[in-house]
Amino acid sequence: KEKSSYVVFDLKYESDAVFMGRNDSVSAPYLVPSLGFYDKSGFFADASLSYLTKSEESRIDLFLLTAGYQLNSKKLSGLLSGTKYFFSKDSYSIQSEIEGDLTATLGYDLSLFKISLTASSYFSSNSSTDFFAGIQLDKSIYALDDNLEITPTFNIYGGSQYFYQEYYTYNRLGNRKGKNNAENPSINNSIAIKKVNQFNVLNLEISLPIQFQSNSFLFSFTPHWAFPQSNATITTNETILKEDLKNIFYWSAGISYWLNTKKK
């Protein structure tokens, strides 16, 4: 069937901001509206904002601009994208010191399951670039005349931890930037993660995306179980500590609308 260009309107709720199996000690629930244009050639652009819904800190916490190219054939799929991040100065998100990323993904359908490989680099103005790699295994199961899709998914992620060191320096609870600590130089003194540049397995994650399509609407719900790996050794002026990583359950739910097209 001939491809067509389309616009997607999306509204999603995320129960917490989790990245590489890490999150802040204070949850960051987001309401995320987005608008994307997908050209039939494969090029796309997307804009979204993340509104922090906690009553005591409600604000627009993040604005994202993404552009890239995607390829889809019967067996092979690929994605190349770049994203620019604009975080609120008060954000305590685990990613809040990241300013941009470049990501490439290549997937192949083996019939029994689909395997995807991902490589990405994340940039920050205050530290070196992080490099990550990931492997994903998933299997789509269809029902209700293919309108219902359930996709059991397993991911392994690995990489460096400069982003985590920056988070501990500026945003960890008790060490916040923003309104109360905006010009306080003491909040970023001598915090370091041992072997921050070393490539380690950071997260094992299981998820179960569930999608239901009705005409041009798509309803989705995805539970995630993250099992973080490679506990960081953190050095401060006062002490050296080994962090105690805990497994994380989080979820998202949303509704999307396709304009002038139907999702295949």
Predicted regions and their residues:
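Repeated loop/turn-to-beta-strand initiation elements of outer-membrane beta-barrel proteins
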Residues: S41-D46, K74-L80, S111-L117, L144-E149, ...
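Solvent-exposed loop/turn segments connecting transmembrane beta-strands
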Residues: M20-P29, F44, Y51-L62, F86-I98, ...
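A broadly used, surface-exposed interaction patch
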Residues: L65-T66, N72-K74, G78-S81, F87-D90
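Short glycine/proline- and aromatic-enriched beta-strand/turn motifs that initiate or cap beta-hairpins
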Residues: K1-F44, S48-L52
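Outer-membrane beta-barrel transmembrane domain signature
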Residues: Y122-K246, Y250, S256-K264
